[in-house]
């Protein structure tokens, strides 16, 4: 597809990152508009698992974490029911969703942690505030750790891309590594 030249080199680079339990992902709004099929094909080629309104289970030493991914979170007509609703509240569930707004706009019950991007950290920030932000909730879901009204924690990353113009000021690119630790009982 035209405009998708970045797909192969991006996923080839991501494939070099060693992930002992696998690599999973969800699509962004621009991915749906342009390169969806090529991204899915390339992810699978490199052994990565796209989660489009699907769940997968990571198991280790008798423990499990459930990953749930949201297909195009901007199409609430078709995707307005979170895949987490069918899961047990006893499980530890991580929700992968492109836009942070989804966890406020849709019930994401049974979610213990949500991971999102989309905002690019504001892309241009002045004194920590983004004058233009592609979230209905403004700077509340700009970057870092936030919570929805149900008190579900959400980590929003700046990511590595840009939108509209290829510029970033005060909102550096980032790839975030999250380490989970079991709480002492």
Feature map (PLM): residue ranges:
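Solvent-exposed loop/turn segments at secondary-structure junctions
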Residues: 1, 29-33, 56-58, 72-75, ...
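Active-site neighborhood of phospho(di)ester-bond hydrolases with catalytic His/Asp-centered motifs
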Residues: 22-29, 51-54, 94-97, 112-120, ...
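N-terminal post-signal-peptidase region of extra-cytosolic proteins
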Residues: 8, 52, 77-82, 132-140
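Short strand-coil-strand connectors
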Residues: 59-61, 149-150
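Membrane-embedded segments
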Residues: 1-49
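Conserved beta-sheet core of the metallophosphoesterase superfamily
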Residues: 15, 100-179, 184
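Binuclear metal-dependent hydrolase catalytic cores centered on His/Asp/Glu-rich metal-binding motifs
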Residues: 40-54, 60-97, 103-104, 109, ...
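A conditional alpha-helix N-cap/helix-loop micro-motif detector
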Residues: 3-7, 95-96, 135-136
């Amino acid at each position: 597809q035209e405009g998708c030249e970045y797909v192969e080199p991006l996923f080839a680079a991501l494939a070099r990152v060693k992930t002992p339990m696998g690599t999973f992902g969800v699509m962004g709004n621009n991915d749906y508009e342009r390169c969806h099929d090529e991204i899915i094909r390339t992810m699978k080629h490199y052994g990565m698992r796209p989660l489009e309104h699907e769940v997968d289970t990571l198991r280790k030493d008798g423990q499990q974490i459930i990953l749930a991914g949201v297909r195009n979170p901007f199409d609430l007509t078709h995707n307005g029911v979170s895949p987490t609703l069918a899961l047990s509240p006893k499980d530890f569930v991580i929700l992968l969703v492109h836009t942070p707004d989804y966890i406020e706009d849709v019930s994401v019950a049974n979610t213990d942690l949500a991971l999102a991007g989309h905002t690019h950290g504001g892309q241009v920030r002045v004194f920590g505030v983004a004058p233009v932000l592609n979230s209905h909730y403004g700077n509340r879901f700009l970057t870092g750790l936030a919570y929805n009204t149900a008190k579900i924690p959400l980590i929003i990353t700046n990511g590595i891309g840009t939108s509209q113009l290829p510029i970033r000021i005060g909102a550096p690119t980032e790839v975030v590594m999250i380490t989970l630790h079991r709480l002492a009982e």
